[in-house]
């Protein structure tokens, strides 16, 4: 089993290139099912989850070719024959559920195993299914599978009880061929949703977002294959911002969408991190003394839950008391016991974590319990005195492209060993 070994205390310097967003790439790959033609997704991040969803498409008959050097993924869904993707692949990743919308839209039916992914809460699929049912889909759940069929999809007004990203994406994709007009109210507003809409519209869909944030989809007859480059990964960018701040370093981050990272920038500036935006780049100066902050994770445009663990690592080293309240997932503090191994002072109170900054962290052996927890442990290891070993790093590989190589280029001492 691979692990990371980090020797802390190094100052970072130089530039790092951000990859395209995994959370954009996965629904876009799923959406290629809709057109039944050849699509090319450019600059795909070579991540475990990307390989899983590409294998998932292969399991239903799609042809997928990946250029490992350029990251270009060529997908031909013209010969998809099965409506039941490989169950073992589905169980590897929760994002597998993103093929429900495209499958019901193009084929009128699907059978899919209940999915896997990070164990950070129940993350129910009821909102996905509620949206599909509103469009006229019949759904049965039993023996670990979800089976669905629809003789005809009809547009409807759908109100989401919570602005779920996955549910919003599935309903959008399920609606592109539905007769009439579908309106999704209280839809998720994440930049990755906008990217999916842009991709679908370039294929020939008729989707728009109005001032209220509602998404309107007017059904079309067909879509065409296209070439497309997804947006940059705002969560990876945020992780490297913290890498600079936690090591008291100055670095340049290339591949930043200013609008998408504004919610994070607000908190980073409140802490005292200096940031200068230069086009698609961000210059980070983390050499100031930082101040504690209180954070509440919220749907976009609030502070992202996917950055909660990473900023906790930074607050562990920031003098004073900070409070993080997690409102999205009910089980997303699994990194706390691992951070305590470094000497962090954290107490959990319900959905809140109270962090009292300590003067220094000490290297230790820790385990990545999920994707973002793994990133948080790497960040702690960068500043900890001595050597840190992090196991179960396959979680990290689900969301970060060669993070150890990018950090090494900046001057960190981190290596992957078996």
From Swiss-Prot:
Keyword Cytoplasm: yes
Sites of 2-(S-cysteinyl)pyruvic acid O-phosphothioketal modification: 118
Domain of life: Bacteria
Enzyme class: transferase
Entry binding sites for phosphoenolpyruvate: 22-23
A GO CC annotation given for this chain: cytoplasm
Annotated Gene3D superfamilies: Enolpyruvate transferase domain
Pathway where this protein functions: Cell wall biogenesis; peptidoglycan biosynthesis
Pfam family, one: EPSP_synthase
HAMAP family membership: MurA
Protein name as it appears in the record: UDP-N-acetylglucosamine 1-carboxyvinyltransferase 1
Organism expressing this protein natively: Clostridium acetobutylicum (strain ATCC 824 / DSM 792 / JCM 1419 / IAM 19013 / LMG 5710 / NBRC 13948 / NRRL B-527 / VKM B-1787 / 2291 / W)
